[in-house]
């Protein structure tokens, strides 16, 4: 007698998918939606993402590693040049490149620039994702999908898939995960169960502090903010049942006037940044946090190679 439905199990798949797109195209929000947890900071400020962060999606049949990259753009500073170089290096090492094109905006020169760059990477599978569909009408989404197909034809880019998705509402997020897994090579699990990111906790904490600092900032100031965690560890002498994580971090800006904006009247804004960041860090790490923040000036750090090295770029 044979067991019905007991045929060979599908092979396990694993691999890397990189989300690319112009600044503020929804890459980070989509990464968090697929992982199911906040592993990448988000903001409506362009060029929020400055590091390559890997978010890990665990499934019975696959492990999908999502590589969130800074937005590709025409750089105006040394920092911008280094971020672009970081993206291009990353794209050479992944299995699938997924280009994010917001459905609530027309395909523009920035999108064309990026897809042209992608066309130069010959052997990597390419997917187009129409992001932010919750902000567009059905007619607009249909028009956008046709524009994406046309852009592929014009640039010589062969799309393996074109997928409309809303990370905010969750619409088609699971479908996108299924499609991406299907494009991965067969392979073993690459990260332990339970790992949601490969970033060190110090980097995740610094990014959450920067996200809190960016809220409400205008003009060029968001680009001038950098955060470095100088010291982080469990406080000694605490009972095991009541741990406390001490984090000492510096928020860097480029000018004295910017320092005053970050601190705010009588330190009110800095306290607010600390309160919001502490809540996010505690939610991510599952440990009560004591957060000590200081604001320092690193003059013109975006253009200074020595300062960039000091700040981790």
Swiss-Prot record:
<dbReference type="InterPro" id="IPR004044">
    <property type="entry name" value="KH_dom_type_2"/>
</dbReference>
<dbReference type="GO" id="GO:0005829">
    <property type="term" value="C:cytosol"/>
</dbReference>
<keyword id="KW-0694">RNA-binding</keyword>
<dbReference type="InterPro" id="IPR005225">
    <property type="entry name" value="Small_GTP-bd"/>
</dbReference>
<keyword id="KW-0699">rRNA-binding</keyword>
<feature type="region of interest" description="G3">
    <location>
        <begin position="68"/>
        <end position="71"/>
    </location>
</feature>
<comment type="function">
    <text>An essential GTPase that binds both GDP and GTP, with rapid nucleotide exchange. Plays a role in 16S rRNA processing and 30S ribosomal subunit biogenesis and possibly also in cell cycle regulation and energy metabolism.</text>
</comment>
<dbReference type="InterPro" id="IPR005662">
    <property type="entry name" value="GTPase_Era-like"/>
</dbReference>
<feature type="region of interest" description="G1">
    <location>
        <begin position="21"/>
        <end position="28"/>
    </location>
</feature>
<dbReference type="InterPro" id="IPR009019">
    <property type="entry name" value="KH_sf_prok-type"/>
</dbReference>
<dbReference type="GO" id="GO:0000028">
    <property type="term" value="P:ribosomal small subunit assembly"/>
</dbReference>
<keyword id="KW-0963">Cytoplasm</keyword>
<feature type="domain" description="Era-type G">
    <location>
        <begin position="13"/>
        <end position="186"/>
    </location>
</feature>
<keyword id="KW-0342">GTP-binding</keyword>
<feature type="region of interest" description="G4">
    <location>
        <begin position="131"/>
        <end position="134"/>
    </location>
</feature>
<feature type="binding site">
    <location>
        <begin position="68"/>
        <end position="72"/>
    </location>
    <ligand>
        <name>GTP</name>
    </ligand>
</feature>
<dbReference type="InterPro" id="IPR027417">
    <property type="entry name" value="P-loop_NTPase"/>
</dbReference>
<keyword id="KW-0690">Ribosome biogenesis</keyword>
<feature type="domain" description="KH type-2">
    <location>
        <begin position="217"/>
        <end position="299"/>
    </location>
</feature>
<keyword id="KW-1003">Cell membrane</keyword>
<dbReference type="GO" id="GO:0043024">
    <property type="term" value="F:ribosomal small subunit binding"/>
</dbReference>
<dbReference type="InterPro" id="IPR015946">
    <property type="entry name" value="KH_dom-like_a/b"/>
</dbReference>
<dbReference type="GO" id="GO:0005886">
    <property type="term" value="C:plasma membrane"/>
</dbReference>
<dbReference type="GO" id="GO:0070181">
    <property type="term" value="F:small ribosomal subunit rRNA binding"/>
</dbReference>
<dbReference type="GO" id="GO:0005525">
    <property type="term" value="F:GTP binding"/>
</dbReference>
<comment type="subunit">
    <text>Monomer.</text>
</comment>
<dbReference type="InterPro" id="IPR006073">
    <property type="entry name" value="GTP-bd"/>
</dbReference>
<dbReference type="Pfam" id="PF01926">
    <property type="entry name" value="MMR_HSR1"/>
</dbReference>
<feature type="binding site">
    <location>
        <begin position="131"/>
        <end position="134"/>
    </location>
    <ligand>
        <name>GTP</name>
    </ligand>
</feature>
<dbReference type="GO" id="GO:0003924">
    <property type="term" value="F:GTPase activity"/>
</dbReference>
<protein>
    <recommendedName>
        <fullName>GTPase Era</fullName>
    </recommendedName>
</protein>
<feature type="region of interest" description="G5">
    <location>
        <begin position="165"/>
        <end position="167"/>
    </location>
</feature>
<dbReference type="InterPro" id="IPR030388">
    <property type="entry name" value="G_ERA_dom"/>
</dbReference>
<dbReference type="Pfam" id="PF07650">
    <property type="entry name" value="KH_2"/>
</dbReference>
<feature type="binding site">
    <location>
        <begin position="21"/>
        <end position="28"/>
    </location>
    <ligand>
        <name>GTP</name>
    </ligand>
</feature>
<keyword id="KW-0472">Membrane</keyword>
<comment type="similarity">
    <text>Belongs to the TRAFAC class TrmE-Era-EngA-EngB-Septin-like GTPase superfamily. Era GTPase family.</text>
</comment>
<feature type="region of interest" description="G2">
    <location>
        <begin position="47"/>
        <end position="51"/>
    </location>
</feature>
<keyword id="KW-0547">Nucleotide-binding</keyword>
């Amino acid at each position: 007698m044979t067991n019905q439905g007991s045929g060979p199990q599908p092979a396990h798949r694993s691999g890397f998918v990189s989300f690319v797109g112009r600044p503020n195209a929804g890459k980070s929000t989509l990464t968090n939606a697929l992982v199911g947890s906040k592993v990448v900071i988000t903001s409506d400020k362009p060029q929020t993402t400055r590091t390559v962060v890997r978010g890990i999606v665990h499934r019975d049949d696959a492990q999908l590693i999502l590589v969130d990259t800074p937005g590709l753009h025409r750089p105006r500073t040394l920092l911008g040049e280094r971020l672009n170089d970081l993206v291009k290096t990353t794209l050479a090492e992944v299995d699938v490149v997924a280009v994010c094109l917001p459905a609530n905006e027309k395909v523009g020169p920035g999108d064309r620039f990026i897809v042209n760059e992608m066309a130069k990477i010959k052997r990597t599978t390419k997917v187009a994702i129409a992001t932010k569909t919750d902000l567009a009408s059905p007619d607009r989404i249909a028009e956008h999908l046709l524009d994406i197909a046309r852009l592929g034809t014009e640039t010589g880019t062969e799309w393996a898939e074109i997928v409309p998705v809303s990370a905010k509402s969750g619409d088609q997020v699971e479908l996108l995960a299924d499609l991406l897994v299907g494009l991965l090579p067969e392979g073993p699990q690459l990260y332990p169960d339970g790992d949601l990111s490969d970033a060190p906790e110090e980097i995740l904490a610094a990014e959450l502090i920067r996200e809190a600092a960016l809220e409400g900032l205008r003009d060029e100031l968001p680009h001038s903010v950098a955060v470095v965690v100088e010291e982080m560890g469990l406080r000694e002498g605490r009972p095991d049942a009541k741990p406390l994580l001490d984090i000492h971090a510096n928020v860097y800006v480029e000018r004295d006037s910017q320092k005053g904006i970050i601190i705010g009247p009588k330190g009110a804004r800095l306290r607010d940044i600390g309160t919001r960041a502490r809540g996010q860090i505690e939610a991510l790490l599952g440990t009560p946090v004591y957060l000590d923040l200081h604001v320092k000036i690193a003059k013109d750090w975006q253009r200074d190679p020595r300062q960039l090295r000091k700040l981790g770029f």
